[in-house]
Swiss-Prot record:
Cytoplasmic side: 1-25
The encoding gene: BMT6
Family per record: Belongs to the BMT family.
Functional description taken from the UniProt entry: Beta-mannosyltransferase involved in cell wall biosynthesis. Required for beta-1,2-mannose transfer on phospholipomannan. Required for pro-inflammatory response in macrophages through phospholipomannan-induced TNF-alpha production.
UniProt-recorded name of the protein: Beta-mannosyltransferase 6
Keyword Transmembrane: yes
Residues on Extracellular side: 47-646
Amino acid sequence: MGNYKPSIKQYVVTVKAIKSSQFGRLGICAVVLLFVLGYPFYFISNNPFDTSIRYQYVDPYNDTTRKYTTIEKQHTDIGGNGTTILYPKNLQLDQTALSQLLNTTETTNPFVQYIGNSSSIAFSQLNQTLVNHSIQVFDPFSNSDNCSDLMTETQLTISQNIIIKESFEIMVKRLMHQLDTEPAFKELAPFFQNKLSLHLRMRSYHKHFYKFARTSVWLKDYGVHLMISRVIYSQKGKKGDPQISLLYTQLYDTNWQELTNTDLLVSMQDITGEYKLEKLQFPRFLPMPFYYNPKLTKGRWYGPEDARIMLVKNQLDMEEPVVIYNSYHRQIANHTTTGKTDGSVELNFEFYRSMFVGWPFRYQLGKSNTDGFVDDRFDNVKFTRVAELKIHNQTRASIEKNWTPFVDPSERDPEDKSLYIVYQWDKLRILKCDISNLVTDDGFIHYSACRFKQDTKHDEVEKVGPIRGGTELIPTIINNKQLWVGFLRAHIDKCGCGKAMYRPNMVVLQKTDMGTFQVAYLSSYISFNIPVPGWKTHEIQCGKRDPNVLIPNGISNWEVATIDGIERDVLTMTLSAADEDNILMDIHGLKTVIKNLITNQKHGNEFNSDSVQMKCVVAYSIEFCRAYGEEQARLGLTGGWLPSHN
């Protein structure tokens, strides 16, 4: 027989001979085959190998050369009733009255009234091992263009830095509880793709959650630090590709031990403006209102970013925390008629990243002020009260960020009605924002009107300089001068260590006799002797495409203690390294350092307005970056890349 090639007619005859039951069996086999071949791809796409199969948990706090804080884990019943209720020392209510007020029992929820002093300084802080740390500061009181004429080298007295130990397990469990039980969080569930339980089982949360930018305030009537952190979640486990950002709040005692499952009894301001006693459980995610669409996540980072917490005086003459942050939101740009007989219109939106102020101890209903219009899903949902910080009579910019907040205690009556913002440090521009009387342009959405208190802007459009953001500014008076002290951050690209370098810069802002502001002193880069891990791989420093990041987040407290009859001030600040490690560090005797700078000022009061001071700070910071990169290359820690700078 030769080669046999069946004709199409023969194929048709063969097919007709197959019984229907055989077709059924073939169909079942095809479905099974598709499942066997296709399911692994579906599983991998939803449960990547790097997080679900080959992921091996590594304790991020196992470096024996570093010092860590502790976590009090006596109570970790997330969502349970076994919490301790802490109430302030100035509240005159017995525990029976408190039980009736909160509809609870002393047995189930023990009440604890704080009876300690108002100081945040712990005994351990006064007995730390301290070292001197040299910094270079520059003043503007000279007509010279020579940086050495503006520069003074001085010493800071600093403590060993401490990494704040985290429990991601507690945090993820708290998030799951809030997603299940709190209306403000339920609509956020799609961002997490039903994988939170998987992250807990596999202990893979460190690959998807990143917690940094921690900043805190001392609540003196409760004897606790209230700390707020930014938590980002990446579905793909990439730090540079998060889909959502949330704010997580925690409580710490004076020794920086975290207090879990603790309630604070606080005076909450409701939507009518009245104050009522309510208990807030910690740790918890703040129910911040923000615009989001879980179906559209590419290139959109939803949620609050770069939050800074600080204390202001409210109308009850009590200290109250406020949070300054930036967030992606939308507003109605215009509307067009649809041409339908029902008179309906089509809304057109614009999207922005703007600055906001939030009050953690106040509520609002709904989130129309971040979404641009009323959504009936949220009409009766309680969120943290927020307001946009908007420059009055000026078109809203597409992006606003890196504002530096402070208050002026001399203007209190009795509350802080205004919030000051350093909008730009180079060619100083300062806003004054009204936070006591919000305004509206459309009778619908209210915002805080910000007006320039000081503006040296030139006619040409200028880019934001490399020195920006940083901590809030803390007021003080030294040598009868009204000053504000903080730590900015300089962001310098391609200076000799990878893609960019971020480091702290100490700043002293001064109010002149004329009522204007000037930068009295500004330092170049400060290392604080803090080890900075690589951005992607901890062991690789100054990677070609990676930033090298140490950012100051906030000043937790700055107080004076008396030791053997001698007064010594202690400033505690928080920093973030590589957007992962959260660090505490103390500076002792900073007021003395500033007093000596003022007393020994080399020049008169003639102010150089040509930004020579800023140029010198940047130049010396670039030199720091170059030397740092060369040292990492010498040590073989750059992953094969040789640092270079422009």
